[in-house]
């Protein structure tokens, strides 16, 4: 029965692919827009209570606050207070306690109202926010969530170590309790934005005698603390996109602990799954998804004599893969009503990395030698290869 079902789905999908690849880009995009408008019109006839609540909160916010003229941090603060930061968070934590997919309504309406796009330097908000909301106590959530969302306090991730990359639970950074504080010693590496961050998501070993998954504790580390040293990691290109962080007798208040002592593994899993969510869904990373637009631009700029059917077919295959990925992300988001993403986003991250890798290779082949003078094509292709785990 299962084999027959899979064959039927494959057959239906192949028919869809064959149909789409015979269409022009304009026809495809027009069809997509028409479907979106149809679904929107159908949805407007019967709005559920949670959707109505979000729209009412947006109406109230936009009546008294104009995002196109206000200071961005001030507007985001008002947005947090209205429960429109992360709508699936609890009331008082920047949310309304509704299902997470309603965040899309908030983002769409605020964009239409002239709100500024999210600053890429606040990317780790998408990781730290859900972790603190899920595992932090009331005082931790009250202290960190609002300034994190407004962008007044930027965050970084302090997970990987020279001897603990894929084997994250094998980390060696130690935290020893001293009254109401913890003394931290160790090194972290590959830390994006650590040089501009105010706080770091820090996972340490607090019980070396316990099994390695059990003796870990999660902290919010003040990156300005005495004993914290951030060093840039210079790449062969001359750039320094990553850092390494050294901690020598750094004192961390117990009030900055996220979750119970020894429960750092559970808290870190929330961070890691939201990282997959952010990357897999195409959010937070400035160029994520831009490869598809690049491929279209390269195609449109090509001489007509070079636009053979095989190349057009390959380009349309990329479009289908990107659209399937987008719809898969939407479905995964709808299923994650608890606000904790599942393994689907790990798969999506790999799928998007493979897709972008193929798109960059496609552009390189179309451009030939001209691709060598473009940073994005020559460097992003191997970068996506690394991101996909190869």
Stretch-by-stretch model annotation:
Residues 7-9:
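Low-complexity, intrinsically disordered or signal/transmembrane-proximal segments
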Residues 20-123, 133, 140-150, 304, ...:
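Amphipathic, small/basic residue-rich leader segments at the start of a protein or domain
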Residues 151-159, 203:
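A short, Trp-centered hydrophobic/proline-enriched beta-strand micro-motif
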Residues 173-176:
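A structural signal for short hydrophobic beta-strand segments in well-ordered beta-sheet cores
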Residues 185-231:
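A short core secondary-structure module
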Residues 228-327:
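Glycine-rich beta->alpha junctions and the first turn(s) of the following alpha-helix
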Residues 323-386:
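C-terminal helix-coil-helix/basic helical segment that borders enzyme active sites and/or dimer interfaces
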């Amino acid at each position: 029965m299962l084999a027959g079902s899979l064959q039927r789905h494959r057959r239906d999908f192949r028919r869809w692919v064959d149909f789409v690849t015979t269409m022009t880009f304009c026809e495809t995009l027009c069809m997509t827009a028409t479907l979106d408008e149809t679904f929107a019109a159908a949805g407007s006839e019967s709005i559920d209570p949670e959707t109505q609540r979000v729209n009412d909160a947006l109406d109230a916010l936009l009546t008294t606050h104009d995002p196109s003229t206000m200071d961005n941090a001030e507007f985001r603060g008002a947005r947090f207070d209205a429960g429109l930061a992360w709508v699936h968070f609890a009331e008082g934590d920047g949310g309304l306690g509704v299902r997470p997919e309603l965040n899309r309504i908030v983002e769409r309406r605020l964009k239409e109202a002239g709100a500024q796009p999210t600053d890429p330097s606040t990317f780790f908000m998408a990781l730290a926010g859900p972790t603190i909301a899920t595992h932090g106590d009331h005082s931790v959530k009250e202290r960190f969530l609002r300034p994190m969302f407004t962008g007044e306090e930027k965050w970084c991730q302090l997970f990987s170590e020279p001897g603990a990359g894929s084997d994250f639970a094998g980390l060696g950074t130690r935290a020893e309790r001293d009254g109401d504080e913890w003394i931290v010693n160790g090194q972290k590496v590959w830390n994006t934005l650590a040089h501009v961050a105010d706080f770091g998501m820090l996972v340490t070993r607090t019980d070396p005698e316990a099994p390695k998954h059990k003796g870990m504790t999660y902290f919010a580390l003040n990156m300005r603390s005495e004993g914290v040293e951030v060093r840039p990691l210079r790449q062969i290109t001359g750039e320094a996109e990553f850092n390494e962080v050294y901690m020598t007798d750094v004192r961390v208040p117990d009030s900055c602990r996220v979750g119970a002592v020894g429960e750092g593994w559970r808290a870190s899993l929330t961070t890691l799954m939201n990282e997959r969510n952010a990357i897999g869904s195409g959010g937070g990373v400035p160029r994520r998804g831009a490869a598809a637009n690049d491929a279209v631009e390269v195609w449109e700029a090509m001489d007509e004599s070079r636009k053979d059917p095989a190349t057009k077919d390959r380009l349309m295959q990329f479009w289908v893969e990107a659209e399937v990925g987008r719809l898969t992300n939407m479905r995964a988001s709808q299923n994650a009503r608890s606000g904790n993403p599942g393994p689907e986003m790990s798969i999506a991250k790999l799928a998007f990395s493979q897709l972008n890798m193929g798109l960059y290779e496609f552009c390189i082949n179309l451009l030939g030698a001209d691709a060598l003078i473009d940073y994005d094509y020559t460097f992003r292709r191997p970068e996506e290869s690394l991101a996909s785990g190869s």
